[in-house]
Structure formats: structure tokens, C-alpha cells
Design a protein with these regions (language model features):
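Nucleotide/phosphate-binding catalytic cleft detector across ATP-hydrolyzing
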Residues: 1-81, 98-112, 142-189, 193-235
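Short helix/loop capping segments that flank catalytic or ligand/cofactor-binding pockets
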Residues: 65-66, 90-92
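Glycine-rich phosphate-binding loop plus the immediately following alpha-helix
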Residues: 92-132
Length: 235
């Protein structure tokens, strides 16, 4: 592994913590985050990494860096970023090509975990493995009947498992679109995070935009980390 040495860190804060009610940087929250990570660490009989610098960035929004650079939206155009993770929903509106942030929204109780729980419950009823890993894999492969026949022990309940997952996905999509009704007038929508593909259909139905104006960012679960790494490399 990597030997203990001086390191600089890039970390993130949820949008509702990074920005204040006026969509300005919340310098107090950012300062606390930096100070917390720059505290000296002492290990008993061991060497520790020394944090020399901490850069704090907002979650979600940086995932759109590369795509907005390709599209080059005008200063009057707005882009809604919807970031759906396991337990949280973050969203923000970018003006132009990161000229400004006009709105942010966060809800720490909306996430893919509600679909995972539904899948695990259905798998349990089908006498099958119910770990989060298996449940998430079943969700991703819910339309692959051959795969489901291999992992669901009670084959007679395969359709019931699929129906429970579909119901949970529909419910999640409805909750996300309800949370974000105030942002229907944007010019485009980008979806990121592990739940992006699950809510894509619901977003397309709820936003009155041309199909090419709504996108799931490539490899959405890794998009934020990838774009932050690219940003730091160029910085």
C-alpha cells in the first residue's frame, strides 16, 4: 500500500451544506470541514499520513464539468443536476457553463435504499439470499430471467420479486419528481449517482423536454469522483 506521507485531499459537502439559502458558498461549513480533516493524527506505534491541504467542493454539480464543456451552453441556459445515491437526493441548477448556481435542494431521506429494501424483502419471501449486494445485483438484472433463475431459490416467485422491485422503482421516481417540481423550467437535466438509471423514465415523463435534453451521465455512479479527479489534474 501507499506509505504514510504528506497528502492533499479533495473532499465534498452535500449541496445544502456547501451553499447557503442564497446559493452562496457557506464559508463556515467549508472551514469546519477543512479544519476537521487537517487535525493531526497520532497512531500508537505507527506513522500516519500528514494532511497538508484540503480542498472542499460541492457534491453532485462537478459531475457535469466535462459534459457542459462539450455542450457550451449559453449564459441564459440552465441545467438541473439530479444526484440520487443510496440514501440521499441532491439537486442543483447550473446557469450557463458554471457561470452561477441558481438553486440547490437536498433530502437525506430519499435514495436507492428504498428499492434495495423492497428487493431484499421479496428475496426473503422467495427463500433467497437477502444481502444488500445480492439485492442490488438483482435490481440491476431484474429483466434477465436466466440470472434471476440462478439466484432466486423459489422459481415460482420470480415474477413477484420483479413486481416488488418495479413498484419500488416507480415509487422512488414519483418521490424524486415530486421533490423537484420547482425545477421544471430548466433547459436540460443531467442524472448522476447510483440511482440515475432507475429514475430516468420518471424524469423523462415529468420534464417537458426533448429526449436529448435529458441525459444519464456516463458511468453515473463514478461521475463525481471522475470529474473531480480530472478537474484537479487540470488545475
Amino acid at each position: 500500500g501507499l506509505e504514510p506521507q504528506p497528502v492533499s485531499l479533495t473532499v465534498t459537502l452535500p449541496l445544502s451544506e456547501y451553499y447557503d439559502g442564497d446559493c452562496q458558498r457557506n464559508e463556515e461549513n467549508i472551514r469546519r470541514k477543512r479544519e476537521n480533516l487537517m487535525r493531526e493524527l497520532v497512531l500508537n506505534k505507527g506513522r500516519a499520513f500528514t494532511v497538508t491541504d484540503v480542498k472542499v467542493m460541492p457534491e453532485s454539480l462537478p459531475a457535469a464539468f466535462s459534459r457542459l464543456a462539450e455542450l457550451k451552453p449559453g449564459p441564459a441556459e440552465t441545467t438541473l443536476i439530479i444526484d440520487l445515491g443510496g440514501t440521499t437526493l441532491d439537486a442543483g441548477v447550473i446557469v450557463g457553463q458554471f457561470d452561477d448556481i441558481s438553486a440547490v435542494h437536498g433530502n437525506p431521506s430519499v435514495g436507492v435504499s428504498q428499492v434495495t429494501r423492497a428487493a431484499a424483502g421479496a428475496l426473503r419471501a422467495a427463500d433467497s439470499e437477502t444481502s444488500a449486494l445480492i439485492a442490488d445485483t438483482v435490481i440491476r438484472n431484474r429483466n434477465d430471467r436466466q440470472y434471476l433463475q440462478r439466484v432466486i431459490n423459489d422459481a415460482g416467485k420470480i415474477d413477484e420479486v420483479r413486481n416488488k422491485i418495479t413498484e419500488a422503482i416507480t415509487s422512488l421516481g414519483a418521490r424524486v419528481t415530486s421533490e423537484l417540481t420547482a425545477f421544471r423550467n430548466v433547459n436540460r437535466v443531467f442524472l448522476v449517482g447510483g440511482g440515475a438509471s432507475l429514475i430516468e423514465e420518471a424524469i423523462r415523463q415529468a420534464w417537458p423536454l426533448a429526449p436529448d435534453r435529458i441525459e444519464v451521465i456516463g458511468d453515473p455512479q463514478m461521475a463525481l469522483a471522475r470529474e473531480i479527479a480530472l478537474y484537479n489534474k487540470e488545475d
